[in-house]
């Protein structure tokens, strides 16, 4: 529904989105709600609020909020070269990289891979510097996409 009604999506307060995220179960519901629904243009238009929201999500006790802190950035980092987006994405990765739950490790891999399109040098430098502390699957999938262009 969020994807089909952009005009209404822009009117959804972040507090409402936060409440919705808190009701989600599993990766499919989180990803359907958070990935590709919010564009870089929309996020950047209200950057101060979004940046605080994304950082806050990454520090929550609930795993669905922590996953959302990464998944909400997948489309924006893929579609915009704005440094604020990749900086926030990498800061959230840094906060969450020690978690072993697949919901987080796969989200880390996803946001790193999608960032290659617009932030190739920055994300490659980050992965090279933090390779030993990032989830192994994220490093493996990142380098495959980086080298071949394919997942």
Positions of PLM-derived features:
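Alpha-helical scaffold domains
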Residues: 1-151
